Regions:
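Domain-scale detector for complete catalytic domains at protein termini or as standalone homologs
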Residues: 1-93, 100-255
Length: 255
């Protein structure tokens, strides 16, 4: 089992009021994203402790080398999740690349014989069995091409895209995360026994609605899909609606 070091490096954003009865909701961000993507969700999902994961290479872990392959990343995240949950019920949420990482984390926990989450939430991500069609590898793109792609996806402030110094900070983890995605190989395993909620959006260039519907084949548990109006980051742009859907799905697990 991989060593994780200081757990606070991985989980830097804690609920302001500790509640031992709160359901841990581990959140994994999109490519290049950090824990701050979920900061506004604090106290927004009643009965849960929203715990965004901070991956190396960004924000408070800027000087650390980011992971570049799925297996290594998932191995350590599975350890972080099982250590923090400590046998309590928990849920997982992942957006875009984070959805794939969350899914593979659940499968890694199963292989270890560890408890499964009570619910898996995925957004902005085609089902893992879908053939990837993301265009040219990001690692080979020139900076202007990467900026153009980020601008097309949305979610990155324009001032940041126009700042050469800021780009030097955000592009390395972004490229590394895309290496995780581009080298990922889906391996068939028995379906999970975990309920899945899929949060799709009407105009997502990286995850068409019909490809998100195929998450149905990844579990024998119930699957529910909600489709939000908007693009790749609709779940954050409509945060109140997203949090209400999470609250509804977790109602039986929270007080």
């Amino acid at each position: 089992m991989p060593l994780i070091g200081d757990l606070n490096r991985w989980l830097p954003v804690r609920p302001r009021v500790a509640d031992d009865d709160a359901l841990p909701l581990f959140c994994l961000p999109h490519a290049g994203g950090g824990a701050s993507a979920f900061r506004s969700w604090q106290d927004g999902v009643p009965g849960t402790a929203v715990l965004p994961l901070q991956l190396p290479g960004r924000e408070s872990r800027l000087r650390e080398s980011p992971y570049q392959d799925m297996d290594s990343l998932v191995a350590v995240i599975a350890t972080v999740v099982s250590t923090e949950a400590a046998g309590r019920p928990f849920a997982l949420y992942g957006h875009s690349l984070g959805a794939l990482v969350a899914f593979e984390t659940v499968r890694a926990l199963r292989r270890r014989g560890r408890p499964q989450p009570v619910h898996l939430f995925v957004s902005g991500c085609s089902a893992p069995s879908c053939p990837a069609d993301d265009g040219p590898p990001v690692g080979g793109m020139a900076v202007p091409e990467v900026v153009q792609m980020l601008r097309r996806l949305g979610g990155t402030p324009e001032w940041l895209l126009a700042d050469a110094g800021a780009l030097e900070t955000i592009l390395p983890p972004f490229r590394a995360d895309f290496s995780v995605k581009e080298t990922y190989e889906y391996r068939a395993e028995p379906p999970l026994m975990v309920p899945i909620t899929v949060l799709a959006s009407t105009d997502d260039p990286r995850a068409p609605v019909e490809q998100q519907e195929m998450w149905l084949g990844e579990t024998v548990g119930p699957v529910r899909q909600h489709t939000l109006a908007g693009g790749h980051f609709a779940v954050f742009e409509q945060g109140a609606l997203t949090r209400s859907l999470l609250t509804e799905a977790l109602a039986q697990w929270v007080g």
